[in-house]
Each structure stands twice: as C-alpha cells, then as structure tokens.
Swiss-Prot record:
GO terms for biological process: L-proline biosynthetic process. Belongs to the glutamate 5-kinase family. It comes from Dictyoglomus thermophilum (strain ATCC 35947 / DSM 3960 / H-6-12). Coiled coil: none annotated. Catalyzes the transfer of a phosphate group to glutamate to form L-glutamate 5-phosphate. This is Glutamate 5-kinase. One of its GO terms (cellular component) is cytosol. One of its GO terms (molecular function) is RNA binding.
Length: 371
C-alpha cells in the first residue's frame, strides 16, 4: 500500500467549475498540473472527469433552461467536446498525450466488452497516455446508465486493476455527522470496514454525487483489494501529497482482507443478472456453509429467460439474494431438471449434461466467507 503505481483520479463537476457553474480554466489547469506531476514521477494516471453538462450549459444557454432528458443529453454531447478541449489544451502545455473514453453500464456488464475495454486501457497506459473517462450520457438511457461518476471511477479502477482510487470532492472526507449541521462532526480518517454504521453516516442514496455514492464506490473497490481515498479537491497539491509524499489526507478506505478475484468481482458488481434461480434450504446451506456448487436437485423455481453462460441471481425461498453465478444451463433446460437427482437428469437429458447448475468457481456469495 506504500507504493501506488496505477492511480484512478475522479473529479466532480463542482471541483472544476467556478461559482457560476461554468468550467474554470484555473481549476482544470491545477488538476492537469497534478496529474502531470504524477506521470513524471513514473506513475500511471487515469482521470474520470465529470463536467460535460456544465460545459454544455456554458455554450448552449437556451437549451440549458430545459430539464428534460433529451436536453440534458444534448448538453452533454456539446459539453463533452468543450470539456475535452480544455483538457487537450492544458495537457498539451506539458506535452502530455491524452485519450477520451466514454462508457455505459452495458460496456462493463458484457464480459467480452469489459475485457476489451480493460485491454484498451492497458495499451493507452503502456504508451504513457492519460485516459480521460466519462459516462456516455448521450446514449445512456436508464437501463444502461451507470448513474454517477463515483461508481464509474470505482468500476474503472477495478477494470484496470488500479492500486488506488482517489475521489476529489468539495468535502474533506467522510465525517461522523453532517459538518454543515453539527458542530460535533469529526473527520473519520480510516475506515477498515464499510458496515451499516458507515452506510448510515453516508445517508440515503439520493442524487448522483453525494456521500452515499462515494461510500458505495469505496465498497466496490475495497472488495477488489483496492484502497480508496476521499479528499478535498482544492487542497493545494492534493495528489502529490497523497501519492508521492504519502501524507494522511482525507478519509482512507482500506481494502477487505479476503477480497474477490477479478472474475468474481465482475459477476457481483458489473454483470447484470439475466434471471433468478430460487434454491431450497439444503442447497443454501451447502453454498453458504460448505462452499459447494449449486446442483439441480436444490433448485425450486426459475424466473426470467437466460442462456448458458449468463450471470444469474441465486435467491433463497424468502427471496433474499445470497449470490450470483454463471449458469451451465439455459432457463428452459433448468426448468426441466430442477429438483431432480443425477439419475433423473440422465433420463431427461441423456448422458451429456453438467452435474452442477453453477460450479463453485463460477459462483460468488453476497455475504462471503469463502470467496
């Protein structure tokens, strides 16, 4: 944890705009200088930057008065170009090449696309390019929307196997209470476990950039073995102090001891389950306590249509999700063999069949003791 090489930096809209909400060349230049400083110290930097819609409002003032989704997407389309102009001009001062990557949730849910994106990042990083990432708001309807750049930055950090995620914000870190409301609020410097208490402090999941989304981002990366630091964006030399000088800045979220491997992490946090498989108490016990694979005999009910190789949710009979996994059977096959033992399955499908619906190597539990 003392020598972070690959760093994902996320910056929010308020951290790169002025008091009127327009992009601030001064603030963006300060951020660019910091990123270049890390690059020249032989670090690898990926920047996740908000600010496209704000940049669009600066240009399209009439359109900015509209509140509908097409207007927001149009503002984002115009603003993303403007935002990248800022970055291109300012990084070019230091002769630092950059690239633009726009993502949707679907790009990360699909395993092949996810791997391809990871490889693209790798190539850019190898070539000493700073990838600048944003959500592709222009095409991101609700079903394929990541929703906020805190979550996006966490998923990018996992996709590229980063050593550290730094979220720069307008707050110093996570406080014990809302510092705007309570004089007794204390900055929490170290968080080793994101439990109910921490989630309660973060508040309800409203909005697209509050403390809740930052804690959820921390949950995603720490489960992948990646630490996260939440710090104030306008702190002078903040990235240098965190990465190069190893100063204690903001709130540090430490990775969990038994973190998920990349494949299982993708299943739990990236993939969209294509169906639901309900299991009996015996199968639940075998998964949770004995680390076994899921067999057809333990399956009670199936919902949704899915094909072999899809990710599905595994639920107990109360409807609580206990895990996710990659299925060896499509939904129609599983419907025929659910609750059946090996001999019965042989009579239905013949000799060529899988013993497991989901092999333990392709299964991840929500509350894990084994993964």
């Amino acid at each position: 944890m003392n020598d972070w090489k690959r760093i994902v930096v996320k910056v929010g809209t308020s951290s790169i705009t002025d008091e009127r909400g327009n992009p601030s060349g001064e603030k963006i230049l300060s951020l660019v200088r910091e990123c270049v400083k890390l690059m020249r110290a032989n670090k690898e930097v990926v920047l996740v930057s908000s600010g496209a819609i704000a940049s669009g409002r600066e240009i399209m003032q009439k359109l900015s008065k509209r509140k509908d989704l097409p207007a927001k997407q149009a503002l984002s389309a115009v603003g993303q170009v403007r935002l990248m102009q800022y970055y291109s001009q300012l990084f070019s001062i230091f002769k630092q090449p950059i690239a633009q990557i726009l993502l949707t949730a679907e790009d990360l849910r699909d395993r092949k696309r996810y791997i391809n994106i990871s490889q693209t990042f790798e190539t850019l990083i190898e070539e000493k390019v700073v990838p600048i990432v944003n959500e592709n708001d222009t095409v991101a309807v609700e079903e394929i929307k990541i929703g906020d750049n805190d979550t996006l930055s966490a998923k990018v950090a996992c996709a590229i196997n980063a050593d550290l995620l730094v979220i720069l914000s307008d707050v110093e870190g996570l406080y014990s209470e809302d510092p705007n409301l309570s004089p007794n609020a204390v900055l929490i410097r170290d968080i080793y476990e994101i439990d109910e208490k921490i989630e309660k402090i973060a508040g309800p999941g409203k909005g697209t950039g509050g403390m809740y989304t930052k804690v959820q981002a921390a949950k995603i990366v720490t489960e992948a073995g990646i630490p996260m630091i939440l710090a104030k964006a306008d702190l002078e030399n903040v990235l240098e102090r965190i990465v190069l000088k190893k100063e204690k800045v903001g709130t540090m979220f430490y990775p969990v001891e038994r973190h998920l491997n990349r494949r299982k992490h993708w299943m739990l946090f990236m993939a969209k389950p294509q169906g639901k498989v309900y299991i009996d108490d015996g199968a639940k016990d075998a998964l949770l306590k004995k680390g076994k694979s899921l067999l057809p005999v333990g399956v009670k009910k199936i919902e949704g249509e899915f094909v072999r190789g899809d990710t599905v949710s595994i639920l107990d009979l109360t409807g609580e999700e206990i895990g996710r996994g990659i299925t060896n059977y499509d939904s129609s096959e599983l419907e025929r063999i659910k609750g059946k033992n090996t001999e019965e399955i042989k009579n239905i499908l013949g000799e060529d069949f899988y013993e497991e619906v989901i092999h333990r190597n392709n299964l991840v539990l929500i509350n894990r003791g084994d993964s």
